[in-house]
Amino acid sequence: MMKTEPRGPGGPLRSASPHRSAYEAGIQALKPPDAPGPDEAPKAAHHKKYGSNVHRIKSMFLQMGTTAGPPGEAGGGAGMAEAPRASDRGVRLSLPRASSLNENVDHSALLKLGTSVSERVSRFDSKPAPSAQPAPPPHPPSRLQETRKLFERSVPAASGGDKEAVARRLLRQERAGLQDRKLDVVVRFNGSTEALDKLDADAVSPTVSQLSAVFEKADSRTGLHRAPGPPRAAGAPQVNSKLVTKRSRVFQPPPPPPAPSGDGATEKERGPGGQQPPQHRVAPARPPPKPREVRKIKPVEVEESGESEAESAPGEVIQAEVTVHAALENGSTPATTASPAPEEPKAEAVPEEEAAASVATLERGVDNGRAPDMAPEEVDESKKEDFSEADLVDVSAYSGLGEDSGGSALEEDDEEDEEDGEPPYEPESGCVEIPGLSEEEDPAPSRKIHFSTAPIQVFSTYSNEDYDRRNEDVDPMAASAEYELEKRVERLELFPVELEKDSEGLGISIIGMGAGADMGLEKLGIFVKTVTEGGAAHRDGRIQVNDLLVEVDGTSLVGVTQSFAASVLRNTKGRVRFMIGRERPGEQSEVAQLIQQTLEQERWQREMMEQRYAQYGEDDEETGEYATDEDEELSPTFPGGEMAIEVFELAENEDALSPVEMEPEKLVHKFKELQIKHAVTEAEIQQLKRKLQSLEQEKGRWRVEKAQLEQSVEENKERMEKLEGYWGEAQSLCQAVDEHLRETQAQYQALERKYSKAKRLIKDYQQKEIEFLKKETAQRRVLEESELARKEEMDKLLDKISELEGNLQTLRNSNST
């Protein structure tokens, strides 16, 4: 899985919850100035690491049920000699930073890590124990019975004056911690810090440390104070630390100091051999008593799994706090010799009360799981550094609930909270007091634990409406992928790009890298696969191959599918605004390698297809026929007959180790890897089957198409023969038409000649007609002239006749007469 880095101050906001203020409040406290970064954590371990505060708190619970072996003389001597000359020192243990939420918690590794850490912390808690220890029962009793037996074996403590002094000292430390608003893990002890440094170096929390500030701000710091605990029997229960503890401080008037009669107190504070340990001889002076600080441990919503689900309801919220006053001393049985009671052992009262209170609280909410017992060699080794009873381990920390808590990165939320300026979260502002426990009637004198009757503070919780984050429709896998992508985007260089989308598009192709959610792998994002030469992106030059598309026109492409991203790009128009993420120079990009492999694979497939097409072309040129099915079956599509599938290959360069030689954590990790490989292999097999089925269907379709093509070829041959006959007839018809055309052309030419001759004749006739008309006109004019002359002559003759007739008449008349 991809390892994520903490989010910077400018990252996108996460969803809100009622506990967000408290969740963000303790973030700054989790970052002391000397805290190592996540890169300084040990990377050689093959399995997951867990938070140092979780293991220390857990180991303190485990030490209450862990049997301490007989101390070696050399080890005990070294511890007693070392205590007087070492001065009280405060060591600040840095808490690891939050890591990915998708890292699964390995419970078997958690048990083993808890055991190894408890061995180291037992150096602060261990005390010399009697050589004879009761043997563990073959069948362990129930959780409540074991806890009650544990309480009954404890020895009550006296002397409240020194308790008040220790409480005053702890109160000063708490006030100092509130001033600098740091959530520290302060360990004050006599001796070297070698074991503690080693413990801090091995502690890295990917998941649980993110829950360490869920319910309180740094004002109301939470922790567990306890002193080196007494050695336990081998069969004592080892409790689980899957519990979020809450501590509130109330001041109570100091009780009257007990009567100094006491051989009892002296006998309780002596060692097993009846002599006082040498650590008691160097007790420093104590200040006058002040009001005592009472610690109360409140279990908040314990989630159980496995056997605990049958015993207690999961998610049970215990609202009532029980203030338990307990006095647990290191001695196992009181001795008979009496000596003056020293003041030094009295300083253990308050821390041991808290330890007993934590055990009493565990009766309600903690499952009955038992961690592996420590080996005798490890117990002897832990006894080599022995510390005085004044050595106080002050652990102020939170315990986590396990994996998949749904939290966010701590540093980013703290920075966002500082920017928003939200008021500090006060979880104890709405508390009420209810009557406490009633007085016990006739308590057993042998019982070493007593319960307080003080009022119980009940704190108000959030209502369902306030706590409802409305996440019913949220897909956990999609949210996880989005979270991983958001963390990955923070490591990229982000820059905006604006492109003008032309008629040919944006000129880029995208690819969605990452396996499916059913395999449990995160998605990697939407990347630029290719840049089209001459396109808009190529002309702009800022978008390159392997770039991550974070946003397009304000639409986030983080944690989306490739089809959704493609639809977003298709729906863009005009000027398109991109937010591009690019790997910083010098960083090794796995995504770039995957995209390069995909491009090479596609190029190789294209070359193979071109070769096959070229082979088909050669076969057609040589034989003029199509390749047969046998040729297709014999010709391999890919080298070795394997189909190339675009899936993620897991690293298989690890040597196969024998299960006997491997540790359980490595076996579990190897098993998870094999599960992932098996899931990937199954996906490949399913994809191969689907491809094979599709190829078989395509092959059948090709055969049907081939038969249809052969039938169509036969039909086309018949049609060609018919067309050839038609073509011959058409040719003969064309010849006849050609002859007729020639004849027609000859006739046309003859007619053309006749027409031209007729035209000449017509012209001649017209010319003659014109001449005839001219002659006729001339003759008519001559005729008219002759008629006029004849008419004139006729008139002259008529006149001459009339004249002659007159003359004749005259003659007759004259004759007659």
From Swiss-Prot:
A motif (PP1-binding motif) lies at residues 447-451. Residues 595-816 are annotated as: Interaction with TGN38. Residues 410-425 have a biased composition (Acidic residues). PANTHER family: NEURABIN, NEURABIN-2. Seems to act as a scaffold protein in multiple signaling pathways. Modulates excitatory synaptic transmission and dendritic spine morphology. Binds to actin filaments (F-actin) and shows cross-linking activity. Binds along the sides of the F-actin. May play an important role in linking the actin cytoskeleton to the plasma membrane at the synaptic junction. Believed to target protein phosphatase 1/PP1 to dendritic spines, which are rich in F-actin, and regulates its specificity toward ion channels and other substrates, such as AMPA-type and NMDA-type glutamate receptors. Residues 1-52, 64-163, 216-451 are annotated as: Disordered. It comes from Mus musculus (Mouse). Its main location: cytoplasm. Residues 480-525 are annotated as: Interaction with RGS2. One of its GO terms (cellular component) is cortical actin cytoskeleton. Residues 169-255 are annotated as: Interaction with ADRA2A, ADRA2B and ADRA2C. Residues 496-584 form the PDZ domain. Residues 1-154, 164-282 are annotated as: Actin-binding. Changing S15E: Increases filopodial density. It holds the Pfam family PDZ. This is Neurabin-2. Stimulation of D1 (but not D2) dopamine receptors induces Ser-94 phosphorylation. Dephosphorylation of Ser-94 is mediated mainly by PP1 and to a lesser extent by PP2A. Phosphorylation of spinophilin disrupts its association with F-actin, but does not affect its binding to PP1. Residues 595-616, 665-816 form a coiled coil. Keywords: Actin-binding, Cell junction, Cell membrane, Cell projection, Coiled coil, Cytoplasm, Cytoskeleton, Developmental protein, Differentiation, Membrane, Neurogenesis, Nucleus, Phosphoprotein, Synapse.
